[in-house]
Amino acid sequence: SFYDYEFESTFEYSSEINSIVDGVLPDVDSGFPTDTEETKSEPKQPDTKPEQPSVSKPDSSVNGIVPGVSEPKPKQPSGSKPDGSAPGLKPGGGKPEGGIKPEPQVPITNLGSSTSQSSSYISITNLYDILSIIFNLSHIGGTGKGYTDRVSGGVGIGASGGAGGVGGAGGVGGAGGVGGAGGAGGADGASVGAGGGADGGAYGGGYGAGYGGADGGADGGADGGGYGGADGGVGAGGYGGAGGGAGGGDYYSDSSDSSDSDSSGSDSSESGSSESGSYYTGYNNDGSLGDNGRGSSGHRYSDHGSPGNGSPDNGTPGSGSSRYTFSDDGSLAYKSQDNGTPGRKATNYRFSDDGSLAYGAQDNGKPGSGSPRYRYSDDGSLGNGFPDNGASVGISPSIESPGGPVLGSLEDELLGSDSSDEDDIDDGLGGLGLGAGPGGPGGFVKTPKHKPRTDKKKKPDDKPKRKPKTSRKPKTSRKPKTSRKPKTSRKSKTSRKTKTSRKSKRKSTRKTTRKSSRKVSRKTSRKPRRKITRRPVQRKQPREYKQESPEVEREHSAPSTTNVEIYRDIIKILITSLTSSRGDNGKSGDDGSGSGNGGGDDGNGGGAGNGGGAGNGGGAGNGGGAGNGGGNGGGGNGGGGNDNGNDNGNDDCHYDDDDEHRNRCEDDDDYREKCCDDDESGGSGNFDLSSILKLMQGQSGSSSSSSATESESSSTSTTPSTSSLDLSAILSTLSGRSQKTRSGSALDISSLLGVTGSRPSVATSRGSGLDLSAVLSALGGGKPSTGTTVTSKPSTGTSSAPGLDLSGLLGQLGPILSGLLGPKPDSKPSTGSPSTTSKPSTGSSSGPGLDLSGLLGNLAPVLSALTGGKKPTASSKPTAPSTPSKSTGSSPGKGLDLSGLLGKLSPAPKPKAPKPSIGSGLLPGLDLSSILGKLSGGKKPISGSGKGSKGSSRFCRCALSCSCKSIDYGCVNIGCK
């Protein structure tokens, strides 16, 4: 078994570690899922254009963490969302089901021994979620706000007067702007606004926004005003509204007949009349402002270059609408967004002056043709970036939202070549403007999804027009369904998984961990045997450093054992501290409360199951949303209907003692089936992010063994005020510098790298979260290798597509830990003495073992420079004996002796707290200070000296075969064999 093999190795440390673990670290048996738990399915990459409605449960789960996908300019939501999720987390978006989707477990392949892989899985869900919180990885597609930026915000919103209301709704994605247009006619607009707007807001926001900018708006907005995205506006409120409305009726029916818009368009007097203009275009055919200078709700230029619509557009050369316009002279109108030079393509969608394609396939500059989104009048002048062109030819909503198939050829559709009646078309235009109110539903939205669209030949007709709307509505109603379906499937998946894996998992992890912790004496007595078998191997192959060879793996499992064990314990603590306070989680009754749904739909029981949705959390239940108790307390009542089932459940599942409950979850299959969550039985462990946030902010009252004095640190670091974890505070605590933390930033990498002495050039991009690979490679000095899969050997800075490649991260941590441990420096590997130090292959991870000595090698010069040690030669080969310097700085060949560094960095000769500690703000449950103190040779926080190595004084932990002495602020290495 993994732990037996790995941790009962030849090192005196293992017993010490065990005593440390038993004394300090909570024992987490269920923290490490075994391989049986491994999720086989590929992680689902959230679509950039989420087809699932991103209507997420208003619970604390993080939806839509989209690792690498940066969105245009997502605005951080200000304040907390109505659903109570943390400020940085916008609900909605990526994942259809609520709750954290269990990510595939990443096998830690670098634990030193190939046989040990099987049971060493760490749940990425936990670490990844933590990291995503830290780095704000989550892009919640949820609200259109981001797009509002693109839209230039107010465009649609205020623009169309009453429509503005719609637009407002559209607020989503600014699409609203267009929607606003839809809102035509104030009053109507308002109604639309309410319907369209509200919906738009809702869908557009949740949905359209997710769709992404213009296109997103289109789809999302379509539902509500959301259409607005930049262009979406059309479909959204504005268009939908307009078209949908009465006017829409006229417009559609006529246009559906489709007439020779080629001729009729330019002739139409209605659209061109100097007063009316269409509601959208708002220009007369001669280019003068129509409708009292209102211009379209969106953005128009008049021919003479005066602003078409107040703030959004301005025809003067060089100025531009907030969205996309060309200056009259063809110079850039809106920064890099648009450019009128012929053939030049605008970021958004422009035609070049010569009518050639400006933006990919999106638009076509031939006069009178155009994409569903932006139209030209027949004479080739700009119609209205949006739905219609200045001639009377409009675009019927059914035509297409951007990005989807267009029904029939654009020209036929748009120009209505079949149309028999010009007047009809004219009416249509009028309809656009007027109909807006009713149109609100502007159902035109989800066009991309909606099937009728694929019928290319069908000319829009009244019925089809409306049908899309109705068919669209079902879609909206279907949204919840789709979001729910994933959930049920997920539930069955997890239950299947836990069923198959629980027994074996319990057998392996629980037993072995207990064995390793309890039967220390046996373990130590067993050690010599292993020593004997392993050392000869090393002697035989003293020089073989091939990273791939299994012998070498075994050779290095020596050091990695220590590291791994400690690392395992640290991970355990992390996981424990994140998951252990389950009782507290339950208290957040909110999830279950209102409906008793068991924390929203997430209810464990899958409805009735655990207490049923209703009883489940009831809030009151232990599990809170998760509803451990299944309505432990009042859960049963919560559901009302569910009472019976729940009450029974309550009796069975009632427990007063969390530990007892946890044990029963492990040992008693029936009890587990009824009363336990996945994570309680050692499953993939979803946990309540809100509690993690609380933990990270240090708000949770429970701190484990760290007492105030233990974690007292002489350097003052401000605890980060936001939910994001500010590592600079931790680093400043370590380094004894007090740095003011940036409350808003997710992670101040520059200060992180600055402290470690690497180049602080890693830019954190707000949108895409933090690219850890860059950080890791900067720390490790290696080139980030891209594209490695999750199971591949760790190479510095690998990032895998769906989630973080923790193997690389673990690989990075290994050497740091071994450095902290100060493994026995081996200056003469060639003699065959067991090598407990990893070889300094600069910046690259070596094989499956936790050997990233390259990182240590790179850091060593920095550290020795910091500590004033003799600068070691970074190029020293592993086989070349490196003379151990007596100074506290160490050479790359041997393990890093951080004790000197930490001692040097501690401020003042006699600070109150003798050992460097990480500020307790990190995770109250995790007392890294004692671990670091111990690892770095600080005073031993816990009395009782495990088996020490030679020269260890009671409070000073030396590296193996080294002697050291305690001094008032730490430990000094006297010398090593």
Swiss-Prot record:
GO terms for cellular component: extracellular region. Keywords: Glycoprotein, Secreted. Residues 23-116, 246-767, 780-922 are annotated as: Disordered. Residues 428-443, 591-643 have a biased composition (Gly residues). Residues 410-427 have a biased composition (Acidic residues). Signal peptide: none annotated. Disulfide bonds: none annotated. Glycans are attached at residue 136. Residues 37-50, 541-557, 660-675 have a biased composition (Basic and acidic residues). It comes from the Eukaryota. Residues 447-457, 465-540 have a biased composition (Basic residues). Residues 51-63, 309-325, 730-744, 758-767, 785-801 have a biased composition (Polar residues). Its main location: secreted. Component of the acid-insoluble and acid-soluble organic matrix of calcified layers of the shell (at protein level). It is found in: Secreted. Residues 251-278, 572-583, 700-724, 803-814, 822-857, 870-907 have a biased composition (Low complexity). This is Aspartate, glycine, lysine and serine-rich protein. It comes from Lottia gigantea.
